[in-house]
Amino acid sequence: MAETSSLISGVAQRYAGSLFELALDANSVASVEKDLGRFEALLSGSEDLRRLISSPVFSSEDQLHAIGAIADKAGIKGLVGNFLRVVAQNRRLFALPGIIAAFRQIAAEHRGEISADVVSAHELTSAQQNELKATLKGVAGKDVTINVTVDPSILGGLIVKMGSRQIDTSLRTKLSSLKLALKEVG
């Protein structure tokens, strides 16, 4: 399993690096990041799209046509639209979530920022996001860009991943720890 994960990570890093270089040459890093975010939102909102990118059952041609149609309908054109088509043609759609995360990380490093992935049980308000950014800036010593995802299964609290560090204050983890402690006592 770890071998597969590192393979996907390697593929994602190479594709993200190539896309970043192209975006930098075209002076369009911000717009590429925005388009990737729009595609990521489509991906998180559609089980069928997630199945399309992860299933080997679909042919390269089917994936290429579907991704092209989805990108066109979503208004994702230019560099990102072409990039998605190349990824589909090369049968690397399974790596798209990793590619998007790697691109964000590379872009943040280029801006002198650090990127943090935040999982919350509920949608964070802009005031909460700003407070979290300020707190993380104090910890990291750099400006922090946060990518927030909502996962109700954590019940409450936050899970923050910043570089190689993870801070898990989720209620689910606290309940699991309490359950283990009670098993040891009883």
Swiss-Prot record:
Location of this chain's protein in the cell: Cell inner membrane
Pfam families: OSCP
UniProt KW keywords: ATP synthesis, Cell inner membrane, Cell membrane, CF(1), Hydrogen ion transport, Ion transport, Membrane, Transport
Membrane topology (UniProt): Peripheral membrane protein
Annotated coiled-coil segments of the chain: none
Record GO terms (molecular function): proton-transporting ATP synthase activity, rotational mechanism
GO CC, alphabetical: plasma membrane; proton-transporting ATP synthase complex
Subunit structure: F-type ATPases have 2 components, F(1) - the catalytic core - and F(0) - the membrane proton channel. F(1) has five subunits: alpha(3), beta(3), gamma(1), delta(1), epsilon(1). F(0) has three main subunits: a(1), b(2) and c(10-14). The alpha and beta chains form an alternating ring which encloses part of the gamma chain. F(1) is attached to F(0) by a central stalk formed by the gamma and epsilon chains, while a peripheral stalk is formed by the delta and b chains.
PANTHER family attached to this UniProt entry: ATP SYNTHASE DELTA CHAIN
Family, as annotated: Belongs to the ATPase delta chain family.
HAMAP family named among the record's database cross-references: ATP_synth_delta_bact
Function: F(1)F(0) ATP synthase produces ATP from ADP in the presence of a proton or sodium gradient. F-type ATPases consist of two structural domains, F(1) containing the extramembraneous catalytic core and F(0) containing the membrane proton channel, linked together by a central stalk and a peripheral stalk. During catalysis, ATP synthesis in the catalytic domain of F(1) is coupled via a rotary mechanism of the central stalk subunits to proton translocation.
Name of the protein described by the UniProt record: ATP synthase subunit delta
Originating species: Brucella canis (strain ATCC 23365 / NCTC 10854 / RM-666)
Biological classification of the source: Bacteria, Pseudomonadati, Pseudomonadota, Alphaproteobacteria, Hyphomicrobiales
